[in-house]
Curated annotation (Swiss-Prot):
It comes from Cyriopagopus hainanus (Chinese bird spider). Residues 20-50 form a propeptide. Ion channel inhibitor. Disulfide bonds join C51-C65, C58-C70, C64-C81. The lineage of its organism: Eukaryota, Metazoa, Ecdysozoa, Arthropoda, Chelicerata. Belongs to the neurotoxin 10 (Hwtx-1) family. 13 (Hntx-13) subfamily. This is U7-theraphotoxin-Hhn1a 5. One of its GO terms (cellular component) is extracellular region. One of its GO terms (molecular function) is ion channel inhibitor activity.
Length: 90
């Protein structure tokens, strides 16, 4: 009886140590993937951004293309790029 209880307690201790190791490995992997995502976002922010096309959402940091202008249009609750009644030069 004592041997069976000792075996069960020993098995539980081994499982606790193994699960702690797996959890630590999973946490490290999660932190690593988060760092990679942040690096990718930072790299994309430094690149030149394209202009916003017709009916695209626009702000000061998201300009419209040359032949469009950023305007507020009701009932849409944000600014959109609309045609400024000019044609782009070829």
């Amino acid at each position: 009886m004592k041997t069976a209880i000792f075996t069960v307690v020993l098995a539980l201790a081994v499982f606790a140590v193994l699960s702690f190791g797996w959890e630590a490995n999973e946490k490290a992997l999660s932190e690593e993937s988060t760092e990679l995502i942040h690096e990718k976002e930072a790299a994309s922010e430094t690149e030149a951004r394209e202009c916003r096309y017709f009916w695209g959402e626009c702000h000061d940091h998201m300009p419209c293309c040359d032949w469009l202008v950023c305007r507020y249009k009701w009932p849409i609750t944000y600014n959109i790029c609309v045609w400024n009644r000019t044609f782009p030069e070829k």
